[in-house]
């Protein structure tokens, strides 16, 4: 069965809104791995079904960032990038404790990125 891009993107956006309890989240096509504001960065889903879990992992980690990123402070330069990665790791850990399927998706995303 072929992957329906629109259905997958709508499902990812709906799931993110439900997890975060924020109906104001919107999707944008961006390479950003960390969401900015209330924007979920969605790329087109892969055409290969075995890569779908990694694509979902990219979405899951952003959903958890939007839900658990309570520290709004930013730092300049490289220190800010490191701080954001630490905040993302925290969000992934907290979210993965709630959703086992998302934990697997995030692991697949991490493998796919490296």
Outline where the language-model segments fall.
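Basic/hydrophobic alpha-helical interface regions
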Residues: 1-114
């Amino acid at each position: 069965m072929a992957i329906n891009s629109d259905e997958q993107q709508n499902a990812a956006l709906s799931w993110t809104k439900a997890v975060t309890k924020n109906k104001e989240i919107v999707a944008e096509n961006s390479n950003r791995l960390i969401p900015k504001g209330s924007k979920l960065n969605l790329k087109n889903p892969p055409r290969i079904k075995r890569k779908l879990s990694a694509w979902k992992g990219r979405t899951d980690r952003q959903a958890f960032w939007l839900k658990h990123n309570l520290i709004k402070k930013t730092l300049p330069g490289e220190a800010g990038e490191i701080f954001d990665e630490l905040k993302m790791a925290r969000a992934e850990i907290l979210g993965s404790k709630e959703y086992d399927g998302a934990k697997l998706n995030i692991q697949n995303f991490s493998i796919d990125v490296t």
